[in-house]
Amino acid sequence: MRIKLSVNSEKCRKKAMQVAVAADGVTSVAMEGEFQDELVVVGDGVDSASLIMALRKKACHVTLETLEEVKKPQVEEKSITPHCCIAQCPVVSNEQPRPEVYRIVHDSYGPTTGCLVM
């Protein structure tokens, strides 16, 4: 929806933007035009009559220029060709496994049969 504003000050533009953003269903609001005097409102289920009345009451005199449905761009589905599958080869290692090393610890004092405290 494109709304023509008759505003001369930045304060009125800000107020008009605030009123438009507060409306139900509005998803985006932008100022366009040579003199930043057109308010572009995009949304789902926006009531244009109530928005125009709210803008006239709270901001300034406005007129509705265009009201149109925003159409989503059509995306052409391209046929997807499957890519050739590349076989993954397993990793082969020529390295020999390392032998396990065990360390044997001997008690130099021998088995104790009693109290060692003297």
Swiss-Prot record:
Organism: Arabidopsis thaliana
Gene3D superfamilies registered for this protein in UniProt: 3.30.70.100
Origin: domain of life: Eukaryota
Stated name of the protein: Heavy metal-associated isoprenylated plant protein 47
Modified residues (Cysteine methyl ester): 115
Residue span(s) of domain HMA: 1-67
PANTHER family: HEAVY METAL-ASSOCIATED ISOPRENYLATED PLANT PROTEIN 47
Propeptide: 116-118
Chain's role: Heavy-metal-binding protein.
GO terms for MF: metal ion binding
Lipid moiety-binding region (S-farnesyl cysteine): 115
Family of the protein in this entry: Belongs to the HIPP family.
Statement: the UniProt record of this protein carries the keyword Metal-binding: yes
Gene: HIPP47
Keyword terms, alphabetized: Lipoprotein, Metal-binding, Methylation, Prenylation
